[in-house]
Amino acid sequence: MVLIRVLASLLILQLSYSKSLDDGAKESAYDDEIQQSSWGNSTVNTTLTETVVIQLIMGGSECYKSKHPFLVYLYNSAGFFCSGTLLNHEWVLTAAHCNRDDIQLKLGVHNVHVHYEDEQIRVPKEKLCCLSTKNCTQWSQDIMLIRLNSSVNNSKHIEPLSLPSRPPSMGSDCTVMGWGTITSPKVTYPKVPHCVDIKILHNPVCQAAYPTMSRKNILCAGVLEGGKDSCKGDSGGPLICDGQIQGIVSWGRFPCAQLLEPGVYTKVFDYIDWIRGIIAGN
């Protein structure tokens, strides 16, 4: 019976998707910096004509400060725009579409309005996108390594996250986190990172939600009934399963956290040899 209900839901989604295309709905990337003035508990109105956006956390709650020592805050003169994950004392993993000319990286941060004693700030020494040191493709290979200009010191609130030892199993319980919006379609940016527990979803669900999308090197994650998702502003942050980074927040459909419309994540394990080779100096 459960299988029948899932298949019926997928059929409904396919029909809804086809109708949205007939009605002129558009799938594309939606990307912008998040201005510092929008931080806090105020709600910011935005005009969104796109159905795909960079991702944020919805349906979750504030992360415990001690539970995200690997989470990196990426910002520039325009404000916060992405998150990243500390892999070791000099390398951060994020999404390729988070590439900017003037990136700064803050480690050991929780509340964006509070300065912490062990907080550290770095800038990139180099940025590397998969298969190219110059051209960062945004969606087909949405992964980027940033080498820091100087090593960071581990502390109570700064510590690397492990790379995956194996790919995640379908149905795995995972956690995604970030400083992205906690409401949609209106956006509300929190002062602190939020965490939400979601699952790695089976390929038929992903195929039904995004029938024209290549499923190579990506994961779909969320909950079938909706209500929990990454959303606008969470891009580049980690999807963590069993204490390892298995995904990088990439994109999804807007509004976020809808029925049978999961978030899309770069599958880190598919790039594990490239990541290890770069870090090893190859």
Swiss-Prot record:
Highest taxon listed in the record's lineage: Eukaryota
Pfam families: Trypsin
InterPro entries: Peptidase_S1_PA, Peptidase_S1_PA_chymotrypsin, Peptidase_S1A, Trypsin_dom, TRYPSIN_HIS, TRYPSIN_SER
GO biological process: proteolysis
Compartments where located: Secreted
Any GO MF annotation of the entry: toxin activity
Pro-piece positions: 19-56
First-level EC class: hydrolase
Name of the protein this chain belongs to: Snake venom serine protease NaSP
UniProt lineage: Eukaryota, Metazoa, Chordata, Craniata, Vertebrata
